[in-house]
Amino acid sequence: MIIKPRVRGFICVTTHPAGCAASVREQIAYVARRGPIERGPKKVLVIGASTGYGLAARIAAAFGAGAATLGVFFERAPADAKPGTAGWYNSAAFHDEAAARGLQATSVNGDAFSDEIKHKTIDAIRRDLGQVDLVVYSVAAPRRTHPKTGVTHQSTLKPIGHAVRLRGIDTDNEAIKETLLQPATPDEIADTVAVMGGEDWRMWIDALDAAGVLADGAKTTAFTYLGEQVTHDIYWNGSIGEAKKDLDRTVLALRGKLAARGGDARVSVLKAVVTQASSAIPMMPLYLSLLFKVMKARGTHEGCIEQVDGLLRDSLYGAQPHVDAEGRLRADRLELDPAVQARVLELWDQVTDDNLYPLTDFAGYKAEFLRLFGFGIDGVDYDAPVEPNVRIPNLIE
């Protein structure tokens, strides 16, 4: 079938298998150009492995360090004439490329928050890897059903204590708009922490440790975004910020647990990129469009694979990791360059409907958004029929 992009709001409801595969190959090629990751991991578990930063971590570990990988994700398979999700096709392509290079790859498809998927993952580690020496936690989900209580918690993107008016882009109409966000209630804050805080990461590490599948010296990291002044009302000072602070508290306990066996636990702070999650946040399309404009002009723009490949080489396995005062690994240094942030702030209130394209890189933002779903990738013939029914080998469901 011929598949074209169909966008509804902040979601593209179609995906292109060949485009997703080409995107994965582009990321692999980037890692290969940078050469081997010295003293890198050899057996890696990535929780949230099918898109964005999690996929990039799996690619960097496998094709940079030669690691065997086990990926956990929650994706929809193709059915009848309906394509699967982008994460499904990304993972299928990853498996194909790994097999071609003789790299072990296993995947588990299901709810990472559940005890069932944790148990299935542990069984797969025992069977295929024995133990893992790196655990990457890269889960972004709007809701979580707690495995012990059965309660489903919904995350909320709101300020705390007062309403906030945010500038942003109505991406459907390509117009500047303002959104008034009311403050979160205490219950909404608690629910957001339950979904996006550190509890599930801790549950994963506790389960892996109790099962004996964490190697001595194992490391774990959870990915997060902090941002700067422009985004603080929504991120650090908002309901999501409370979840991020919970992540910072959680990592201290995990670090103590792993350090006893020569290991380590860190929160890794990554730069703002286009993801399905960030596209839904009212101010982020405008912020990203300005950030891309400024960083591309300076030659410092990076996407997921550049960020995570650099994180592994420079900090997780580098001799001189970039660590902040709170012990987090920082890969967002170029985004937070004072000159970059000052220029973004300078342009923020100047953007109008009339100058949206010349003043920002909204065109680049839109292109990156479509790339998430396999569209706009160089070398792909989007007028040619493509087979949507792609399977993932070594998949556990």
Swiss-Prot record:
Tell me if NAD is a UniProt keyword of this record: yes
Location of the active site: 235 (proton donor)
Protein residues bound to NAD(+) = 48-53, 74-75, 111-112, 139-140, 244, 273-275
Write the record's keywords in alphabetical order, separated by commas: Fatty acid biosynthesis, Fatty acid metabolism, Lipid biosynthesis, Lipid metabolism, NAD, Oxidoreductase
In chain numbering, where does the site feature Plays an important role in discriminating NADH against NADPH fall? 75
Q: Which Gene3D superfamilies match?
A: NAD(P)-binding Rossmann-like Domain (3.40.50.720)
Give the Enzyme Commission number.
1.3.1.9
Q: Name one GO molecular function term.
A: NAD binding
Q: Which GO terms describe its biological process?
A: fatty acid biosynthetic process
What reaction(s) does this enzyme catalyze? a 2,3-saturated acyl-[ACP] + NAD(+) = a (2E)-enoyl-[ACP] + NADH + H(+)
Q: Which residues bind substrate?
A: 225
Keyword check for Ribonucleoprotein? no
Pathway annotation: Lipid metabolism; fatty acid biosynthesis
Name the family. Answer: Belongs to the TER reductase family.
According to its UniProt entry, the function of this protein is described as:
Involved in the final reduction of the elongation cycle of fatty acid synthesis (FAS II). Catalyzes the reduction of a carbon-carbon double bond in an enoyl moiety that is covalently linked to an acyl carrier protein (ACP).
Q: How does it assemble?
A: Monomer.
UniProt protein name:
Enoyl-[acyl-carrier-protein] reductase [NADH]
What is the scientific name of the source organism? Answer: Burkholderia pseudomallei (strain 1106a)
Q: Which gene encodes it?
A: fabV
